Amino acid sequence: MNKNDIAIIGGGIIGTVIAREVVKQYPQASVSLIERQLCGAGSSFYSAGVNFPRGISERVREMSRYSHDYYQPFVDDGAPFYFLPMELVTGKAHWEETCSNYLPTAGFVLSESMNPLIYLSEDGGQVVLRGKGAHYADVFALIQKWLLALRSSVAVREGLRVTALHPRRGGYDIALSDNTVQAASQVILAPGPWLAEPAWRERIAGLGIRVKKIVAVHIASKPEPGAPLTIFHDEDAFLVPCHSRGHWLFSYTSQEWDVLPGETGPLQARDLAAARELLRRYAPALAGEIRDGRVFCDAYSPSREPVITRLDEHLIFAGGANGSGYRLAPAIAADVIHLLTQTAF
């Protein structure tokens, strides 16, 4: 049986950032990162990787600020970040209230759209605000970059499903799909949307977290250099120029709940139709170029704030990031470290 001080279950962006911070905080600890697929191949793989300074509450805005600052030093280190101009479309009657959901660093000012393909009718009752502080990332590539540096200090175990968590004196025995057992003093559960796994389903049921489908469509038109990220705040949607892939991406809010990660399936006609209907209000030319996209799911908390909590003295849950795993991962990891520092192990 292998014995670790800390075992992290889930190798998405949240689990990977937690691993980075654990190694920094506890350089002498034995640490493992366990992932049922390849690290980054779950929700992180499908993520648009969009980061902008927004939060539904003061807590989430602070988490957004922390994470934004965390990512900045990696810009000059070859991280797959792509910085973008940013604009916000919202109702004229409540634009000041809308801006309160964003950090002051966004610096929003009333403007015209920077995207010539965006059309707002004169009587539509909407305004455009220009801001700053946005980027998108290739989240899967970022995870691989960080894993390369982590492998010398973290035991990365990919392709292994956790089949059971057995409490033991001083920690947990983690049963794996290859019939091995790994012991750990502290277990950090960062499962993304895999909430229904028998190993932890009952342990987290009381958190009230549910899994919702996420849809983003691709638009077969190459963005011009300098094209902005456009946030449609009232619709909870955004349009991002994916320069690294040579197409636009439009993400909108799906309301299909209680899905399972293994059963989201491919895009359906209704997914594409819903995207076209919404985008046609603002950019009919782009709406007409929607042909394909991506679909997966993520975990959503009742409060729409990430959940970082101790389930017992040896088990921490970190998740329910509400589709913002990349945007908030560093702050989530910081909260995990805070919980760990309160425990001797």
Give the residues covered by each predicted segment.
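Helix-loop-beta segment of a Rossmann-like dinucleotide-binding subdomain
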Residues: 79-89, 112-149, 259, 313-314, ...
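Helical element adjacent to the flavin cofactor pocket in flavoenzyme catalytic cores
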Residues: 129-177, 190
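Central helical "cap/lid" subdomain
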Residues: 180-228, 268, 285
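Active-site lid/adjacent beta-loop-alpha segment flanking the redox-cofactor pocket in flavoenzymes
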Residues: 225-311
